[in-house]
Amino acid sequence: MAHAVPSEGVRMRMQGHSSGVLLRTIVIGLTAFLTVVDLFATQAILPSLARAYQVTPAAMGFAVNSSTMGMAVAGLAVSLFSQRINRRLGILISLSILSIPTALLAVAPDLTTFTALRIAQGLCMASAFTLTLAYLGEECSAADAGGAFAAYITGNVASNLIGRLVSAAVADHLGLASNFYFFAALNLAGAVLVYYTVAKSSPMMQMGPAARSPFAAWIAHLRNPQLRAAFGIGFCILFAFIGTFTYVNFVLVRPPLSIGPMQLGFVYFVFLPSIVTTLLAGRAVHRWGTRPTLWSSLALAGIGLPLLLLPSLAAVLLGMVLVGVGTFFAQATATGFVSHAATADRGSASGIYLACYFAGGLVGTAILGQIFDWIGWPACVGGIMLSLGVAAVLAVRLEMTPTKEN
């Protein structure tokens, strides 16, 4: 971290001495929280939205998770133009604009408009998300990188828990419209945080004369077998995560569990353990390596899936805890791996990874939603298990120590 500059407020570089590690971790985590809090918070009110728009669970689930479509597109766009984008300014603009579609969701007249606004949200969220990952990769020292990425993913985890709790509470007491206005205010708070805490950085093309063209960077990344595997793993992780935490909402409110809207929000305390464990991902990789850490994470998530089929709230909650801990730990591991495997054009590599990651969420929503509607929850869980298995197979390609690109 850079020392504070009084005339500019507290501006922080994402590197530095141990005395600033805690403050750096808090800033990184809070930035992540405010960047993606809209992504999953709406899932806590999925049953209420389905009733309001009078549509099926699959239709509402696809509309809510269509934000991942925008995120995939934005991830690719940012990866193309990453070398020309000032990190801090890009993050600041993305979070500011994000508040507009978020507020408009409060007055969306139909499902088509709702879906379009969620896509717009995704475009803004992914732009900020991708640029922040690139910023961390470029500004962190090798020793600090694992902890920085773990802190960022931990903020993501916290947004899942707190976002869902807040969304359920606000919607239950003040209505669906107030819920979206509240989250628009959080988006603006994120922009303010970035303005006062993130140090200025130059576009990468200004940092050296040998910058590659965007398409050359893409080709280099896709020729790297380890990066290709990591991109596929990202796809599978969000496929499994969204498949679980979108459609389990409908299982929880139906017999025999039959919990209410406010109780549904409190269910997401299942993410609390993930907030603690995800911070340890960097240490785990440093001690055991990328591949064993990923396999252990995916296995833990797989162990939780059968519990989701039992007619017991305690069993389902335990299963959700295990799936959450496993998938978030795997995400933090894969994200950090991509940053180090791509020793050049990290913004481009992060963009491709996030495009694959969020595409997995969209595909998972579409496919598993149809399975849920037409075949049932057990078949849906089977599809989720399959995606974790594919991720485990892809992890074979990852070496203990990432290889550098030429």
What are these regions (language model features)?
Residues 75-86, 277-289, 372-373:
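Helix-to-loop junctions at the C-terminal end of transmembrane segments
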Residues 54, 86, 107-112, 141, ...:
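Helix-breaking motifs and short loop linkers at transmembrane-helix boundaries and internal kinks
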Residues 9-18, 199-231:
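Juxtamembrane intracellular "pre-TM" segments in multi-pass secondary transporters
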Residues 113, 142-144, 151-198:
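Helix-loop-helix hairpin linking two adjacent transmembrane segments in secondary transporters
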Residues 101, 112-121, 314-322:
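Paired small-residue
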Residues 291-334:
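C-terminal transmembrane helical hairpin of 12-TM major facilitator-type secondary transporters
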Residues 73-111:
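Conserved MFS/SLC helix-loop-helix module at the cytosolic interface between two early adjacent transmembrane helices
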Residues 117-156:
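Cytoplasmic helix-loop-helix junction between adjacent transmembrane helices
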